[in-house]
């Protein structure tokens, strides 16, 4: 009954009664993005709190449904960015590896590889000033697609996609 913007709804593999979804919106205006609920409406629960200087984005289930993955990005302090995994039963969080500033990412059906598209800026679009937009329009940024080897915990650039939310 809350007046929230829900998104990224996903049914858990091997457990179709568990649904992962997010409270969508600018990261600094929501207090928790990651949520779980059972298909009958029970076990509605927040997976983790989200302070206003933390971005959590593009959550997805691992193919076996044992965990879900997401990007974790601090916007202040050390500005840590990494891929994290969470157990949907215990809500225990695990750091998989550091990563580039992905806007989106997903894994293959064996969870051997992931691909991510970088967004070219570590400043979220709703916080870009007019001056920053003009400056970015004339530069080649970190707009790459990356391949991640999950076992080796490494990433490499595959190609430059050159697209942007800005234009």
Q: Over which residues does each language-model region extend?
A:
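Multi-bladed beta-propeller domains
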Residues: 1-4, 37-55, 85-102, 149-166
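Loop-centered beta-sheet repeat module
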Residues: 2-46
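Conserved beta-propeller blade repeats
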Residues: 2-19, 51-71, 99-117, 121, ...
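Short strand-connecting beta-turns/loops that link adjacent beta-strands
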Residues: 14-16, 27-28, 52, 64, ...
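Short, conserved, GDST-rich strand-edge loop motifs in beta-rich repeat architectures
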Residues: 21-31, 73-77, 116-140
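A short loop-to-beta-strand structural motif that recurs across blades of beta-propeller domains
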Residues: 33-35, 82-84, 144-146
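Extended hydrophobic-aromatic, low-complexity segments
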Residues: 82, 94-95, 105, 124-127, ...
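C-terminal closing repeat unit and adjoining cap/tail of repeat-based domains
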Residues: 117-121, 131-167
